[in-house]
């Protein structure tokens, strides 16, 4: 009987510990440590709020698919994804309205009026290059350069049918080559040509593969390239292609019927706080609130003249045509 009592007590203590741990947890889909320096942000969230957020390496599309699959019994509390996926999540009714502190300082076009999604930062798409892995080849300066045979097997872009940055790549290339959101023929033609150059097409962030030299050239955002160059001290260059590119926001949402809603709200409050926005700025992301980027960080960006080649698009329209583009890409390219 005494042994049984000790065993029961141990089980109860373990259960209480698990409950306590759960009480201090918020599950975030798509918070990978090697992307946008989420690793530092999550440590700051834990230190400031006491809420632990486990790392998660899904991409935007995988996160939305998981939310839809779990709609009847949600697992996640918050989700981070590209703006078009935020719009789709709202349409699928898998996210709830929440307006964090600092909400009023988010520009009107970068948040849902009811709080179902809101931007937290933005970045500009371009070409991230591990110069040492090029074997003496010049750093490509244009989308056209990536089609050259000398770069065969060296170029990577994330899957446009799943990852937001992949879809952004398609939209940017399409726009740069004369297409628009009603006509993706230029992008499809480009990816068909690039396919002959043996590209690498991962679904998740390939940051570490660029740093190792396994993937010398990656279509990616400025913030990842600057982090590689100035924080990880890699010989990495970032190029905004001569034909042009686009800048896009990333957004977050509170999951509908989140199991740890209060903790999820704390996470969302923090990423929009002065401290959270300052961390994004230090990670080379452009904060969505008017938080000053450190002078030394701003000085490491490409000149404004280069950024003049990056435009913006209608994100609502971009979301509306995303599914059709993905289907066409899978049918005609992949």
Segment roles from a protein language model:
Residues 105, 123, 188-193, 199-200, ...:
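Periplasmic-binding protein-like
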Residues 83-90, 211, 216-235:
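A ligand-binding cleft/hinge motif common to bilobed small-molecule-binding domains
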Residues 126-133, 171-175, 248-261, 271, ...:
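A bilobed periplasmic-binding-protein/Venus flytrap-type ligand-binding module shared by bacterial periplasmic
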Residues 255-310:
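Mature extracytoplasmic/periplasmic domains
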Residues 297-334:
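Extracellular/periplasmic bilobal clamshell ligand-binding domains
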Residues 23-88:
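Early extracytoplasmic/lumenal segment of secretory-pathway proteins
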Residues 31-39, 75-214:
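Extracytoplasmic ligand-binding site segments that recognize negatively charged/polar headgroups
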């Amino acid at each position: 009987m005494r042994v049984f009592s000790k065993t029961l007590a141990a089980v109860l203590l373990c259960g209480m510990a698990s409950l306590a741990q759960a009480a201090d947890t918020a599950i975030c889909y798509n918070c990978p440590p090697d992307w946008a320096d989420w690793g530092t942000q999550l440590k700051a969230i834990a230190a400031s709020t006491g809420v632990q957020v486990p790392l998660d390496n899904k991409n935007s599309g995988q996160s939305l698919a998981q939310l839809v699959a779990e709609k009847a019994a949600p697992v996640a509390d918050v989700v981070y994804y590209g703006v078009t996926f935020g719009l789709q999540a709202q349409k699928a009714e898998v996210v709830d309205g929440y307006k964090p502190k600092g909400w009023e300082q988010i520009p009107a076009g970068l948040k849902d009026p009811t709080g179902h999604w809101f931007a937290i930062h933005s970045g500009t798409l371009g070409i991230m290059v591990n110069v040492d892995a090029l074997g003496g080849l010049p750093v490509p300066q244009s989308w056209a350069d990536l089609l050259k045979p000398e770069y065969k097997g060296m170029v990577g872009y994330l899957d446009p049918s799943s990852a937001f940055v992949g879809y952004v790549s398609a939209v940017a290339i399409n726009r740069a080559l004369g297409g628009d959101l009603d006509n993706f023929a230029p992008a499809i033609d480009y990816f068909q040509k690039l396919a002959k150059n043996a590209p690498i097409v991962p679904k998740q962030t390939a940051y570490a593969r660029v740093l190792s030299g396994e993937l010398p050239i990656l279509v990616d955002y400025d913030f990842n390239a600057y982090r590689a160059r100035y924080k990880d001290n890699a010989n990495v260059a970032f190029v905004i292609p001569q034909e042009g590119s686009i800048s896009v926001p990333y957004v977050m949402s509170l999951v509908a019927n989140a199991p740890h809603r209060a903790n999820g709200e704390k996470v969302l409050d923090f990423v929009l706080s002065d401290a959270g926005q300052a961390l994004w700025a230090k990670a080379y992301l452009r904060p969505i609130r008017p938080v000053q980027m450190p002078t030394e960080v701003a000085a490491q960006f490409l000149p404004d003249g280069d950024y003049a080649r990056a435009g913006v698009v209608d994100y609502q329209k971009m979301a509306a045509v995303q599914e059709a583009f993905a289907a066409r890409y899978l049918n005609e390219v992949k």
